[in-house]
Structure formats: C-alpha cells, structure tokens
C-alpha cells in the first residue's frame, strides 16, 4: 500500500508503510518545551485519604511526581521511534478537585533538534498510572481521561497554545 497520497505528514512512515526513526541530524538545535494535563476522576473519599496521608501505600503524589519526572528520561526506551533527548527540566504537579486529580506536566524542556511533547505525554501518563496503582484498592472505578497537549514551543513548527488555538476541543 502506498501512503504518499494521504499521509505526507506522517514522518515515521515510509511510502511503503513501514516504520522508521526520522533522521534529525540536519535539524537546527533550539530550546523546546511542552505543557500537558491529564484528568483522573475518582471517589471523593479517595481524595480525602490523599490529602490526609491516609493511603495504605503512602504519599501517592510524591510517588506520582517522581515517576512522571523519571518517565521523561525513559521515553525513548518506551516509545521505540522517539529520539533520546537530554531533558533539561521536567515539572509534574497536581491540582486536587472535589472528585478528581488533575496531573499537570507544566514544563518539559530540552535544547535539541526534536520536540518534547512525547516526553511530557509520557510524564503525565506514568504519573497517572502510579496514582491509579496507589488508589486501586480503594476505588476500582477511577477513570484516566483527557490527556492532552496544552502548549508547545520551539522548533520549525513554532509555538502552539491550546488556549489561543482555533483547534480547541
């Protein structure tokens, strides 16, 4: 199957449909940054335990934060076609609501030739998975939802912010 007619923007696919790692050796190095969020909907009782350090496995937010930061550094090992990047900064924070925890990867930064969206996506995903692991004995109905890129900057494609984009969903 030839793909050039419908997938000119899919850089990880050759025209015959096989996957390959994109050659970034000729790209110009620049500062790259990405910001993401994820929602974790759960029982309010779990959130009460979370804020009072009452979870059986310990401090869930600390574990999730560190796991998210570590995930940024391991992205190329988990996502085969991602280039390994020197991560300069990774910030993972949480906003507690009445029935949800919002995981925010406020900044993943690098100085390199490719973006850090995949590293930020991996950070919020792994942080959320760690929260789920720590809550699952109490709330089996928790839902991970709405993982999305909020903003990115740097590189040839320039800056993008969901808050100012016409592509809001």
Curated annotation (Swiss-Prot):
Active site: 133
Annotated metabolic or biological route of this protein: Cofactor biosynthesis; molybdopterin biosynthesis
Superkingdom in the source lineage: Bacteria
Enzyme class of the recorded protein, top EC level: lyase
Gene Ontology molecular-function annotations: cyclic pyranopterin monophosphate synthase activity
Catalytic activity: (8S)-3',8-cyclo-7,8-dihydroguanosine 5'-triphosphate = cyclic pyranopterin phosphate + diphosphate
Pfam family, one: MoaC
Family: Belongs to the MoaC family.
HAMAP family, sorted: MoaC_B
Assembly and binders: Homohexamer; trimer of dimers.
Cited function: Catalyzes the conversion of (8S)-3',8-cyclo-7,8-dihydroguanosine 5'-triphosphate to cyclic pyranopterin monophosphate (cPMP).
Name by which UniProt lists this protein: Cyclic pyranopterin monophosphate synthase
The encoding gene: moaC
């Amino acid at each position: 199957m030839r793909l050039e007619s419908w997938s000119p923007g899919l850089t990880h696919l050759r025209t015959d449909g096989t996957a390959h790692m994109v050659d970034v050796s000729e790209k110009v190095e620049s500062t790259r940054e990405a910001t993401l969020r994820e929602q974790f909907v759960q029982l309010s009782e779990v959130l009460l335990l979370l804020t009072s350090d009452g979870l059986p496995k310990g401090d869930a937010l600390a574990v999730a934060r560190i796991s998210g930061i570590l995930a940024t550094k391991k992205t190329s090992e988990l996502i085969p076609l991602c280039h390994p990047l020197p991560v300069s900064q990774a910030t993972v924070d949480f906003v507690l609501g009445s029935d949800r925890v919002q995981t925010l990867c406020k900044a993943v930064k690098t100085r390199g030739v490719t973006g850090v969206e995949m590293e930020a996506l991996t950070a919020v995903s792994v942080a959320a998975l760690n929260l789920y692991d720590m809550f699952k004995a109490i709330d089996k109905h928790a839902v991970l939802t709405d993982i999305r890129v909020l903003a990115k900057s740097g590189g040839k494609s320039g800056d993008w912010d969901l808050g100012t984009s016409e592509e809001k969903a």
